[in-house]
Amino acid sequence: MHGITYDPVHDEFTVPQQFGQAILTYRGGANGEERPIRIIQGPHTQLDAPEHLDVDVAHNEIFVPTRQGSILVFARDGQGDVAPIRVLGGPDTMLGGDEPLVVDPVNNLLIVGGTAGRGQRRLLIFNRTDSGNVKPKAVIGGPKSGLYSFGGPFAVYPPKGEIIVSVRGPGPYEELSSDDAFVGVWSIHDNGDVAPRFTIGGPKGVLKMPRGIALDVKNRNMMVSDKRLNAVLTFHFPELF
């Protein structure tokens, strides 16, 4: 389980269950051994060991990447063995495997991680409602981008069109800590081999293996969890907002 999304409108949180081939939704105040209030599970779902997801509260949809290189979209209130309401996938999409994703509900975009060979990664930007074998409208990646193995779920700040990504760093030991790990910020308008507009971490920085990212808009802070440090770090980041 490498993804968890909180829905403040309905006070629910949703998680993927890799071994149960399921998407589980709990009430926000769940405690102890409590049953989920909804379960998406079964052969019609096409779920295959899901690890990541994002919930678009504005449009009541759940986005789930698959290991086969597709994105399954479900109704937020889906229950049981339900088929996705649409599927994004095919060779033109450049999707490949279960990579992190995030929805920008304001700018109507879907940002998905993709592979680029030799350990490099890229960001694929689609229209939120894209379905079938559709080419991304923009692709960010290349040596200048510094995109290697992704650390965890992405984040977006729609008012400024920003994409926030945790990157583990290059090399064959991407599962281990890296002095090159960083959090980078790109624009939804970027395309091609574009360097991040802002970075935290990098060569000899404090981050070793960044994973999750959360934004505290009110106080202009960014919180980053780091698996190797076993810590959550809070950075004051007014430039982001």
Residue ranges and their predicted role:
Residues 21-26, 70-74, 119-125, 172-184, ...:
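Structural motif
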Residues 14-15, 64, 164-165:
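Short beta-strand elements that form the blades of beta-propeller/WD-repeat-like
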Residues 34-42, 82-90, 134-142, 193-201:
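Beta-propeller fold detector
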Residues 1-10, 43-61, 91-109, 113, ...:
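Beta-rich, blade/repeat-based domains predominating
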Residues 209-241:
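Blade-level signature of beta-propeller repeat domains, shared across WD40, Kelch, NHL, RCC1
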Residues 18, 28, 66-68, 76, ...:
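Short loop/turn segments immediately following the C-termini of beta-strands
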Residues 25-33, 73-82, 125-134, 185-193, ...:
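Short loop/turn segments immediately following beta-strands, especially the blade-tip
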